[in-house]
């Protein structure tokens, strides 16, 4: 376990070592942090690529890491612990130079199973939000105590720099679905936050954390939203506990398509959440800088190289070829194997994606949605069938030519569909770049759309660090390139307002 914590002296030394890399002060803590941080959503200790990307980022001068107990079911924190411990052991970085943030609230995977076991024992976590099958939420002090112990073990740390309540508004969502009045729900919501803050102050006293805060997706929401989290109300709670409280950091989503953090006047004095945070000298982390959610569609703010889009006729023919190949498996391959009727039916069900593609290929909405379906739904199904067939003892020689042929046909169909969505994404990226460039001359200096999205945020007064999911070393390099370019931090409210209602 690494002792110590991030210090003003240590982070200043990091900033000096990596000049002209750009850093800023994190609230009143005196800590200097890079204007882009390593966001650990969807990274895992078991993936070498993620390990190398985090290592590259830390050595390049990125000195803020944001993770959570539920990311990769604990694997994200384990990755941070392993990489940081390795670099610290070899004296490549020091504990004092890097700010580590983690979060608490979700019960998924292992935590969900822990919760079910406690229920069976008659000792359920208190104030548990039963949100959905496989998903619960909790910010009760008892749960926070349990989770902080586990997080510190995975991170291999004695002390965590910042510990955030992770989307506590899940309670408000649950309350709305179960008929609790909005007035009663909000009263209970802020009461739960107060109890959590009281406990977090004791964790500061114990030396297990230095500061605490909240990460909420609804900080930038309209005040009329039933799930809105009022920073002003949260600040009042912290102030009521002690004039020397340790509530020092918030996190919220913001990007070129979702500028509410700047433009939504949702505090009682007409300020935005970012303005209020700036006045109270709170640190502000921004998440989802490159992933916008518009009308339930995921839009990736990164440039995609366009290719010639295949025609509808070409795609239809390729999908017909795929359906024919699926039919060959049913008619010629499976009858030669010693499989039960039930197993044959399962194999056919798994591999039958041609019909779905024929009906739906043009309705997936965006390149990001199509890529997600292709990579995490369709392709794994096919791989599962191929692996199953290759393991059969009754395998005949005719199976191997079919496997090779089917994979080629599948790749051709996937490629043709991708070409359509890639063309759409490239056109959309060009329109977005033009709109953003006209909104602010400083933003126009960025080389790529992803760098433009980062530049817009890091140049906005009140934003401390932008969290970027740098899962590959190439993503790290893209961020480092942008952070090496000078840009003034200033009030850019008018620039952000020009982006409101930006069309896809």
Place the predicted regions along the sequence by residue.
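Short, acidic/polar
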Residues: 45-58, 137-154, 227-239, 449-456
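N-terminal binding-site loop/beta-alpha segment at the start of enzyme catalytic domains
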Residues: 1-120, 126-130, 134, 142-145, ...
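Fungal eukaryote-biased detector of long internal structured cores
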Residues: 137, 143-145, 150-153, 157-158, ...
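Outer-envelope exported proteins of Gram-negative bacteria
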Residues: 99-101, 160-165, 211-217
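Short beta-to-alpha linker loops that shape the active-site pocket of alpha/beta-hydrolase fold enzymes
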Residues: 68, 163, 168
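Short, exposed beta-strand "edge-strand" segments with a Pro/Gly-rich flavor and a Y/T-containing core
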Residues: 1, 45, 90, 132-139, ...
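Alpha-helical hinge/cap motifs
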Residues: 61, 156-157, 210-213
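Beta/alpha (TIM)-barrel catalytic core signal, keyed to glycine-rich beta->alpha loops juxtaposed to Asp/Glu
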Residues: 4-13, 18, 73, 168-504
């Amino acid at each position: 376990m690494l002792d110590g914590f991030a210090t003003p002296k240590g982070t200043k030394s990091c900033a000096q070592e990596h000049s002209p890399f750009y850093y800023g002060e994190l609230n009143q803590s005196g800590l200097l942090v890079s204007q882009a941080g390593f966001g650990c959503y969807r990274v895992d200790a078991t993936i070498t690529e993620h390990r190398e990307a985090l290592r590259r980022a830390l050595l390049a001068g990125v000195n803020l890491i944001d993770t959570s107990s539920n990311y990769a079911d604990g694997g994200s924190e384990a990755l941070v612990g392993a990489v940081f411990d390795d670099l610290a052991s070899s004296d490549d970085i020091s504990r004092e130079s890097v700010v580590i943030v983690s979060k608490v609230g979700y019960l998924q995977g292992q935590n969900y199973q822990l919760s079910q076991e406690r229920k069976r024992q008659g000792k359920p976590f208190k104030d548990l939000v039963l949100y959905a099958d496989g998903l619960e939420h909790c910010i009760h002090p008892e749960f926070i105590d349990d989770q902080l112990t586990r997080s510190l073990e995975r991170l291999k740390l004695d002390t965590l720099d910042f510990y955030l309540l992770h989307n506590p508004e899940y309670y408000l969502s649950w309350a709305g679905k179960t008929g609790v009045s909005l007035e009663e729900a909000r009263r209970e919501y802020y009461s739960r936050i107060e109890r959590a803050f009281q406990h977090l102050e004791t964790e500061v006293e114990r030396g297990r954390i230095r500061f605490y805060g909240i990460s909420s997706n609804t900080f930038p929401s309209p005040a009329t939203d039933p799930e809105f989290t009022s920073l002003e109300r949260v600040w009042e709670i912290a102030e009521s506990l002690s004039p020397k409280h340790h509530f020092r950091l918030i996190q919220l989503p913001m990007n070129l398509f979702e500028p509410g953090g700047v433009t939504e006047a949702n505090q009682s004095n007409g300020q935005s959440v970012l303005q209020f945070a700036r006045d109270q000298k709170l640190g502000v982390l921004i998440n989802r800088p490159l992933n916008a959610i518009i009308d339930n569609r995921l839009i990736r703010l990164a440039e995609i190289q366009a290719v010639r889009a295949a025609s509808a006729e070409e795609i239809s023919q390729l999908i017909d070829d795929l359906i024919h190949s699926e039919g060959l498996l049913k008619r010629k391959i499976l009858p030669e194997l010693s499989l039960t009727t039930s197993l044959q039916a399962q194999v056919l069900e798994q591999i039958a994606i041609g019909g779905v593609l024929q009906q739906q290929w043009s309705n997936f909405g965006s390149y990001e949605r199509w890529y997600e379906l292709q990579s995490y739904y369709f392709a794994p199904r096919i791989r599962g069938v191929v692996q199953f067939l290759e393991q059969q003892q009754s395998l005949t020689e005719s199976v191997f030519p079919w496997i090779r042929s089917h994979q080629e046909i599948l790749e051709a169909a996937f490629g043709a569909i991708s070409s359509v969505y890639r063309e759409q994404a490239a056109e959309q990226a060009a329109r977005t770049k033009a709109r953003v460039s006209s909104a602010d001359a400083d933003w126009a200096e960025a080389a790529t759309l992803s760098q433009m999205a980062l530049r817009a945020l890091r140049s906005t007064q009140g934003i401390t660090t932008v969290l970027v999911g740098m899962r590959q070393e190439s993503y790290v390099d893209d961020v480092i390139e942008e952070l090496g370019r000078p840009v003034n931090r200033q009030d850019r409210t008018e620039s952000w307002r020009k982006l409101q209602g930006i069309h896809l």
